[in-house]
């Protein structure tokens, strides 16, 4: 509403930033239209959303791709999927890859491969010069006049559309995510798969037979002349130099493979079931795990792997330099048309190579006093790796890239404050350095009475192998009491998958549905279905199920940071910050987000169950204050079911009173009965429809017009309500 009023009254153009693309879509399809409708401003305030270039189909690339495919004997499935894409983008209304319905991917198996080859190339796509009628170009044009543009935080951090829409007035929703994801936004990343793809793009066509790329399953596309080959021709690079480039690329690929093979063929392959993650220098002697050698437990550290990575990176840098030198030797020739598209494309790709070289160089630098973490992550199956250079002082970068450009900024979230202060949020992002006003709004919901927070005193801790079994039994018993409508959240994907496999056997025997991921969320809205949804970190926010659709949220454990997490380990080490200071804000934000799934509207209530709350009483006491003074009750598993039944019955009694009062008022039932101006069957039907619209399962099954009595069934309880007495008492309240 503030954005709409500011746009309408003061003629301001604003950005609204959300955490995810799903929330973008919710704002565009639901929230903004509803507010405009309620204010009578439909058609008077323009709005839309935009994503990064690579989220859109490029018509030029699609047409070239189709032409190439026609000469390569494509299969029927490949042709049909290409025809679908061609028709999709006609007219410039469609072309957002993420908006393609999942059923399309089910019916056209080849479409994912096609989309990788036809999305907008950031180096080639220049909307101002594009003559095609494409969605992305149209959206860029609309930005110039659009009142409200919705983006996600990732795009906001690097906002590439400053010419069309400057960063002057922004509203940031779910702003708490910036404190954690800010490190990702400003990181420099080398991903081995992305690097391979870039090297594949620049590999000279005439020597492709000597490369490893020719043996890939998609080698058909490697046997064609690529755009970069045309760039080589524009630069008049000699065959001998192209051969040197090919040789350097081969050597880089060898080093990429050797980094992965080092782990796969050595002792590291047997010490962990998870991705290997460590800070290249500060955790070099951290223990990965133990192996038995000659009957003796031997500790394995990251030292050997770190040394191998450093050696390979030095060789990769050397070969990148060799490629860049050859290209730049010819790039400034006066005879070259520097305005040609192919020249600009090639130069941009060469700059990408330079950027990668610089990241490798910074990754290898080591200074205990600098403000970076150098993080290695190796895929557990040794198929991929990622090197990250992460800036630790994101306040400087946030101020430079965002705050310094703002006229006004509003940062919103239900979880910005900790211990009744926003200091953590403001200090992390540098907002404390600029003029700001802090406003903490008291919650509109009665958390203490509507939400019961429960932990267990007698089940095993999360590290125990029996933990998924114990959780599954409890969740299945909860689901019988709640008739489904339960969301089980997990900090660990592995634990989520194990629990799903156990829990589905219990639930199927009770005729309860179970869904393994967030795709099942929409089924919770159907009050006639009895379902349980398991979700990971993506479900901690953005889940909005009103009323009886969601009455229980469970959490496997308090989401504490791993003290050996490379980023936070580095922060603690370099700045002498203790674990509690680092962990508590992050943990509390996540718990508040999880609990916040329950109370979303006037008729919401429920139980928030944390299976492993830990043993630190001082942390739990502080957490209670941050959970709106909700007491965390630790009970044994035998008492638990009586405890939640009592809470649910008490809450439902309050909900029923509220929904009946609002329904009677909305339909003017009291006055109609007084005037004897009502058919009891019609009014009963109208009341029940109104109650269901409020996402409540209560049902009026009998009405006595003369006595003004109603009999209502709500779950397993029946209520007799006399409207005269009821409305009089509720009006007093």
Indicate where each model-derived feature is located:
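Conserved interdomain hinge at the start of the Helicase C-terminal
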Residues: 459-487
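N-terminal targeting/trafficking signals and adjacent low-complexity tails
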Residues: 609, 613-663, 670
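Conserved helicase motor "Helicase C" RecA-like lobe of SF1/SF2 P-loop NTPases
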Residues: 493-516
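Conserved RecA-like ASCE P-loop NTPase motor core of nucleic-acid helicases/translocases
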Residues: 13-20, 410-412, 484-491, 495
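A substrate-engagement module of RecA-like helicase motors
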Residues: 11-14, 18-147, 207-243, 250, ...
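Conserved RecA-like P-loop NTPase helicase motor core
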Residues: 458-464, 520-614
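A contiguous, basic/glycine-rich beta-loop/short-helix subdomain that forms a polymer-engagement track
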Residues: 122-146, 157-160, 313-454, 517-518, ...
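Signature of the SF2 helicase/ATPase Hel1-core->accessory helical subdomain module
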Residues: 22-25, 29-30, 129-145, 153-304, ...
